[in-house]
Amino acid sequence: MPIVKVRENEPFEVALRRFKRSCEKAGVLSEIRRREYYEKPTQVRKRKQAAAVKRHMKRLNREQQRRQRPY
């Protein structure tokens, strides 16, 4: 868990904002959402495979767009 020390004369809102930013960088919220419910190993593999296919298709589409002439 990220730790944020409140500086002298620092408003609470600023410290809270720094804490939220450090939590987001550490991936705490995404980890909590991922572990909220048990996911079977087959579902994990299927989800990762689908994400890989989606990334690949996105990359292909970007390359295809680059090769087309804009007229």
From Swiss-Prot:
This is Small ribosomal subunit protein bS21. Belongs to the bacterial ribosomal protein bS21 family. Keywords: Ribonucleoprotein, Ribosomal protein. PROSITE patterns: RIBOSOMAL_S21. The keyword Ribonucleoprotein applies. The keyword Ribosomal protein applies. InterPro entries: Ribosomal_bS21, Ribosomal_bS21_CS, Ribosomal_bS21_sf. Residues 40-71 are annotated as: Disordered. GO terms for molecular function: structural constituent of ribosome. Residues 60-71 have a biased composition (Basic and acidic residues). Residues 43-59 have a biased composition (Basic residues). One of its GO terms (cellular component) is ribosome. GO terms for biological process: translation.
